């Protein structure tokens, strides 16, 4: 429920206690709902909002521009666009990102499309931006390539399981120690694949259960990992 969603954000803010920034997922395929959740996330203490493209109703690029501009006008919090068309059926194109990047409250994008041409276009938008416009990967398999191509980081599924390693890879790339970063990254290619043997977040939650962090239970319509994958 929306109330539970906000309680998770509030709990996270309290646990973090200012040590690192909190990025709250507050997107919706309803602009009004996204504004409400983003406003509440800011009130609770989130530092950034992550706004997924509207799913199911699949607006065109004009609709996406108006959707995001309306949220950015109404909510005075740093906002990150989130593009994951494989899950939403909605793809925010680079030319649309370029328009949105000019709004002072829209400070970056989490891009889950694994495509070098797309990455290059977004990096170029970032370079041309008068303000810092940040490019984050939303795809563990290609995040190394995105950052070494000029991107800024990753919002990662695998980081739930190996947070230090993902952080180390990013730091090494920033320090231009690319070969060292690549050696670490190559060790986890199999893990990146395993995390998507079923729909995310089923595999990552099963691994966290096996690590002793959470219970082995999911809410419908998600179900536990198929036993044939447990080995």
Model-predicted segments: where are they?
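A short acidic, helix-capping loop that chelates divalent metal ions and anchors anionic groups
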Residues: 54-57, 165, 216-217
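Catalytic alpha/beta core domains of metabolic enzymes, predominantly
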Residues: 73-74, 87-196
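Glycine-rich phosphate-binding "P-loop"
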Residues: 83, 106, 219-220
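A general structural signal for well-ordered alpha-helical segments in protein cores
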Residues: 5, 9, 34, 68, ...
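Conserved short secondary-structure transition element at the edge of the structured enzyme core
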Residues: 147-151, 189-222
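Tryptophan-rich aromatic "cage" segments
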Residues: 225-231
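Active-site beta->alpha loop and helix N-cap motifs at the rims of alpha/beta catalytic domains
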Residues: 1-89
